[in-house]
Amino acid sequence: MCDEFIHPGLVSDSRLSRRRFGLMTAAAAGTAGSALAQSNAASTEVTVKTPDGACDAVLFHPNSKGPSSKEKWPAVLIWPDIMGLRPAFRDMGARLASQGYTVLVVNPFYRSAHAPVIGDNFDFSNPEARARLTGYRAAMTNDGIDRDAAAYLAFLDVQAVTDKGKKAGVQGYCMGGALAFRSAAAVAGRIGGVGSFHGGNGLVTDKPDSPHLLIAKTNAAYLVCQAQNDDASNPKVKDDLKAAFAAAGKTATVEVYAANHGWCVPGGAVYNQAEAERAWSNLGALYKANLI
């Protein structure tokens, strides 16, 4: 759920500067900072061909021991939130890769614009700015998302640093939570773990294409981390999710965190470090148990 009520005054702040953000987070005690994560992860700007065009994205993997290294790691696809691929998500991709994964962070709006799709003065409470992003999202049909997910996993699987013998993961933030659910169904043979972070009420709708109705078609374990203000607006979502997981016989954790929609993304107006770190820890446990 991404609207002006859930995202009051959400703007692009100075921490969208890669250098400044890295220095700030690296200095935070007890936090795996951006600078540290990037020192342990290699990144490459890539273009992923899809049936609908060409997606700009960033590929991350742990720094190998040298050009002759034959190390391989499980693949993970990251769907950003409605503000798209930007420095915060690059840093999150690097952090995950440093933990032993080959990670692809995509521009979900490639059909409409090259990333980044927001500037330093972006304000989500501005109706015109918000309408531009929702227009980008509207260009992503369900069939298109399914095609994208298949293309992204195929791209990951041809990388020399991807361990195709292990299941892949997919995680999404805000609108990306629903996209992660769709991806798990579209590439059911590959996805073993799904993470949704402040996916909001878009995970359960009254429409026939509701993401929660896809759960039975997947072969994954789930971690669903809901925001407290999303839950307050519709407390029934968590219960419907739990019921859907139980009916499908899927392993799943559904929890409401003590933080607001968007809390996992560093640099955001509602970033909550303590709850974000807890989400990282739970994601690590999900992938360790299921990307095997």
Give short role names for the model-derived ranges.
Residues 35-68:
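N-terminal cap/lid segment of alpha/beta-hydrolase-fold proteins
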Residues 16-29:
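N-terminal export leaders
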Residues 70-81:
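Short beta-strand element of the alpha/beta-hydrolase
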Residues 218, 224-226:
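Short beta-strand/loop motif that positions the catalytic acidic residue
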Residues 121-169:
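Gly/Ser-rich "nucleophile elbow"/oxyanion-hole loop immediately N-terminal to the catalytic nucleophile
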Residues 248-292:
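C-terminal catalytic histidine-bearing segment of alpha/beta-hydrolase fold enzymes
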Residues 1-16:
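N-terminal secretory signal peptides
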Residues 149-211:
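Primarily recognizes the serine-hydrolase "nucleophile elbow" in alpha/beta-hydrolase
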